[in-house]
Amino acid sequence: MSQQHRVRRAALAMVAVAAVACATLGVLAGLGVWKPQGSFVGSWSAATNPLASTVPNPADSFTSDVGHDKAPHRQRVRMQPSQFDAVASPKKLRGTPWANITVQADGIRTMIGNRITWIGYFRSLPHYDGNISLENISGLIADSPTPDWLRETDPGVFLLKVGIVQSPGTTMTVAAPRVQELRMAANPYVYVAGVSSTGIFRGVKVTSWLPATNAPDPDPLHRRPFISYDGVGARLDTIDSDFSFLGSDSSEAYGVSWGTNTTGQSLRSVFHDNLFGAYTGRAVNVTFQNSVFRNNAVYGLDPHSDSRGLTIIGNEAYGNNTHGIIFSKGVVGSVIANNHSHDNGANGIMMDELSSNNVIQNNVVERNHGGGIVIQGSSNVQVTNNVVAGNTLGIRVNGNELGIAATNRITGNQLSGNYNGIKVYGGARDTALAHNVVRDTVNTGMVLSEPTTSQSDTVINAQKGVMVRHGASTLTGLSVQQSARGVVLADGTTATIAGAQLDTRDVGIDVHDAATVTLAGANTTTITGARKGLVVSGMANLSNVTMDKVAKGVVLSPAGRLSVEDGRIAAQDVGLEVQGLGGSDRIVLHNSDLRATDPVAGASLADVSSNKLTATMSWLAIAGATFVALALILHLLHRMFAPMSSVRHRGTPQPAHSGA
């Protein structure tokens, strides 16, 4: 090979190497792995916002047509006389046919109306040990003129046909092994009630009973029997017991009730198929622990009317026609923790009507047909570290005409698979969200329709990450990932966003309906991957913002106004697109860097001296350049090796071909 050929081949090899390098860089640039010096790569980010107008407001009396019977229409009746009048106001019973057994410290009185018909004394029992028990009462009644009022029908099974009322200071036990089941005839004025007294149910089954059918009464609209304790010093304990098919819609007759000033506990008990599973009204320091509230006609567990100091821990509420657990009308100073409320017809856990200063923590609330956790007309509620999944609405906070909702704290909750995640509306004030994670929301991650602060909340996989409407909200450290839209502002709202990370498919931040957004703070807000980084038809004040891997950086509508300070926008197509007339007088751009195929489209900026506008190659141009470089490489490689073959054969005689 001649010297000339060697030089030629070396030169061609150098050109080929250079072409390969250029093509490689072009491919890397097209993939976003490498950028020319002076460009920037924004950090990963995410943010979301949904249109609140699409978010339903679940009715608090919601009933499901799947998996739940229709909740009975409330037909409240007022019992006259009440179950307590035999002790408190016997004159009210005058002339009535209602019968009851009044339990006193020394014995019992049988009564019809206000008239005593018979008296029995416990000391007459052959084996009386000083304790008042259901079997002792039955033993006395057996010697009365009305022995069928309470009798043992089978071993351990007792049938009660009238009311039992305990007088103040008495303690009555209904307990295994002597009592296995208490059947209460499904007639009006059949009950077990205590006035400033104690009732203990241990290891027993208590239910309504229809002698004609030899079965419990399944109809919650009937005047079914109930259990209720009331008065200063009253106590009701239910331990390892089952209460079913009890309750009617009358004051403290809902099933099993802890009334005014009553304390006590429910441990490892089951409340099912009652009107309300269990109820408290003005009760004090009652504990419900490791119990089950299921398939009740209205509520599972209903603390009510100024009850206070309650502990609701380790329970399960499911299959109830409305709410699983509801605090209503001034229930305060209580804790709901480590419960599982699921598959109820309305809300899983609810605070209602001034039920304030309560704690809801470490619960699992799932598959309810309304809200998972609802704070309605209640204040100073701490909602912390709950798992809320598969509900119509995950967590909602709202005021109404019955009470304001103020200074509620929603912190560290895990929400997933809800139609909407968190919603704040209806006059709620000073709500604070922090460190919540909202995943796989069908519609919107968070809807903030009242002034709210959000600190380090995360939305993953939603149609809209965060929807801000009305008032002024602040979002700090927000992260939105794998969502179509990041933050949407509407209805004249004002929002401040700082240090957000918005990784969206369609729009990073959408400002419309005369809304105003301010991006500020020491930490950079980053918008990544969106078709449009920022769409403005209201007012946008941007400071310390980065947009990267977006098709268009900022789209300014004819009604929009824009101010950018220290912005960094790297777009594939357009850095700033100005729609309509008079763009320059609606834009203030200072100390910013716009890099795009077309840095500014639709208007001329009045002053660009402090900004850096860089036109870059489009992805189509990069692809074309890469194709040309590869074609050149193939051509050069062909030129490098093809001449060697031609030199080898030049001047060499061709071999002769012999004939056939």
For each feature predicted by the language model, list its residue ranges:
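Predominantly soluble domains enriched in secretory-pathway, periplasmic, or organellar proteins
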Residues: 383-385, 409-412, 433-437, 452-458, ...
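Beta-strand/loop edge motif enriched in small/polar residues
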Residues: 10-15, 26-313, 317-336, 341-345, ...
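Extended amphipathic alpha-helical coiled-coil/heptad-repeat regions
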Residues: 349, 368-380, 384-391, 399, ...
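N-terminal export and membrane-targeting signals
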Residues: 1-17
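Extracytoplasmic/lumenal ectodomains and periplasmic regions of secretory and membrane proteins
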Residues: 556-602
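Sec-dependent N-terminal signal peptides of Gram-positive bacterial secreted proteins and lipoproteins
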Residues: 20-23
